[in-house]
């Protein structure tokens, strides 16, 4: 009996050892084939560019007193500039009279004072009136479609201006620049205080204006 009992116990012990060895082998195999998990974090950098707001000279900075306007707008891309004004708006008109003549209200683009600039609320772009002590004394044109009564304007050459008006043109070179002012001086004594000015880059006209002295010959905003 004892022999049989020892045989059974020995067999059981061997079986247990073999089973434990199998478990260890399985664990070693798991560790060998387990792939480490790597987590990659992507950092995103957002760059914000500051927005700079530039106040344009043609941006309204206020309003003029309310005025009743009757009729249609009279200024358009076919308007013509002359020594005395722009179509129905003539130099010497009060602000109210000029707005009524233009068929639209004006809005200041520089602070109101004894001298300020204003643009029409309706009509073509590129028109700026100079208001001096409540009267219109000058108009600047930066619209290539608006031309003189002779049909010249922005984009035309200095040569054409000189050929067309001859001795009535006085040329001034702006300091430290290749730009020039070609100034039309009327021969009629009744227009002696008026001028039409063509500004060039040295070759072609880039801007024009007209008005009364002394404001018409100013190169800086009043």
Predicted regions and their residues:
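Positively charged n-region of N-terminal signal peptides that target proteins for export
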Residues: 1-4
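Extracellular mucin-like PTS domains
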Residues: 36-63
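Hydrophobic single-pass membrane-insertion segments
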Residues: 18-32
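Second-shell loop/turn segments in exported
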Residues: 82-89, 145-152
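Hydrophobic alpha-helical membrane-insertion segments, chiefly the h-region
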Residues: 7, 11-22
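Short acidic N-proximal helix/loop "leader" segments that mark the beginning
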Residues: 60-80
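A cross-family detector of function-defining hotspots
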Residues: 30, 93-132, 158-204, 210-213, ...
């Amino acid at each position: 009996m004892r022999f049989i009992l020892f045989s059974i116990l020995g067999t059981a012990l061997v079986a247990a050892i073999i089973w434990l060895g199998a478990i260890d082998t399985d664990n070693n195999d798991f560790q060998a084939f387990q792939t480490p998990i790597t987590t990659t974090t992507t950092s995103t950098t957002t760059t914000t560019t500051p927005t700079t707001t530039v106040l344009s000279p043609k941006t309204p900075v206020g309003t003029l007193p309310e005025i009743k306007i009757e009729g249609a707008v009279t200024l358009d891309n076919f308007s013509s500039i002359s020594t005395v004004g722009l179509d129905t708006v003539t130099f010497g008109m009060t602000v109210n009279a000029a707005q009524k003549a233009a068929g639209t209200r004006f809005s200041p683009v520089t602070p109101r004072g004894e001298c300020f600039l204003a643009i029409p609320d309706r009509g073509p772009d590129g028109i700026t009136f100079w208001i001096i002590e409540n009267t219109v004394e000058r108009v600047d044109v930066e619209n290539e479609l608006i031309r003189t009564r002779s049909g010249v304007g922005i984009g035309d050459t200095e040569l054409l201006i000189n050929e067309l008006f001859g001795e009535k043109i006085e040329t001034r070179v702006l300091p430290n620049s290749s730009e020039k002012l070609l100034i039309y001086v009327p021969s009629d004594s009744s227009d002696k205080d008026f001028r039409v000015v063509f500004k060039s880059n040295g070759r072609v006209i880039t801007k024009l204006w007209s008005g009364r002295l002394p404001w018409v010959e100013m190169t800086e905003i009043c």
